[in-house]
Design a protein with these regions (language model features):
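Core subunits and conserved enzymes of cellular information-processing
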Residues: 3-242
Length: 242
């Protein structure tokens, strides 16, 4: 009887150990999956922004604002995107009413490859000749750039490991003030870049990266993010919301 009881205890212990190992492996698999999703979203975001900049038929508004302000100043596009990111991080801290170092570090980590890749991809796309395509195809590609950006935002907002500060701002506004309404949140977040573009135009009487794609982004980007939340990786839900 004692041997049978000890045997049962031993089997239960082994089962618990096996269950723990399996759970750990599942967690690791989940993290690998999230990492793949994150890399996919980063590439979508960089390619989408680079497309809109290269085609000059209208960028997403934050990128368009960076293009116009960099034209007014001697600052490169990559550096201007980085500066915008820092200013938005400060805004996010004010809205959250706290300094979340993990969140801020994540913002900076995201900005480095994003700013660099957009600055690199844009001239590469110009060099392959996409600006020589018929106007209709260029318009389609420009709108596709905005769609790619929306896909990217949807994915990495749900992962919520690290976000571009502008998309972190949109997520904060979306869930803090608008009960998850991505369309309203995006319109509010677009106000600062619109003001920056107006100021740039007043100084130079020139305007860049503003066109049909910008209008498309203004009208549809927020709504597209909400749509892609449901249809792109639908098993991926919003994580770690405050």
């Amino acid at each position: 009887m004692r041997l049978e009881f000890c045997d049962i205890i031993d089997r239960v212990s082994k089962w618990e150990e096996g269950f723990f190992v399996q759970a750990t492996q599942n967690k690791e698999l989940s993290n690998v999956r999230l990492l793949i999703y994150f890399i996919v979203s980063l590439m979508f975001n960089c390619l989408g922004n680079a497309l809109t900049v290269a085609l000059n038929l209208g960028s997403a508004l934050w990128t368009a604002a960076a293009v116009n302000i960099s034209d007014v100043t001697p600052v490169s596009l990559s550096m201007m995107l980085f500066i915008f990111g820092v200013l938005i991080i400060i805004t996010n801290v004010i809205l959250l009413n706290k300094i979340d170092l993990k969140r801020i570090i994540g913002n900076f980590i995201f900005m480095v490859p994003f700013s660099t890749l957009v600055g690199v991809f844009s001239p590469l796309l110009i060099n392959v000749g996409i600006t020589s395509l018929p106007l209709f195809l260029r318009i389609v590609l420009d709108c596709m750039g905005v769609v790619f950006i929306s896909v990217a935002i949807s994915i990495y907002q749900r992962i919520n490991w690290m976000l571009h500060p502008a998309d972190d701002l949109m997520q904060i506004v979306r869930f803090k003030f608008f009960k998850g309404n991505s369309s309203l949140a995006q319109l509010v977040v677009f106000m600062p870049p619109i003001i920056a573009i107006i100021v740039s135009y007043a100084l130079t009487h020139q305007i860049y990266a503003i066109n049909i794609g910008t209008v498309f982004a203004l009208l549809f980007q927020g709504g597209l993010v909400g749509v892609f939340d449901k249809i792109v990786f639908p098993d991926l839900k919003h994580r770690n919301l405050e």
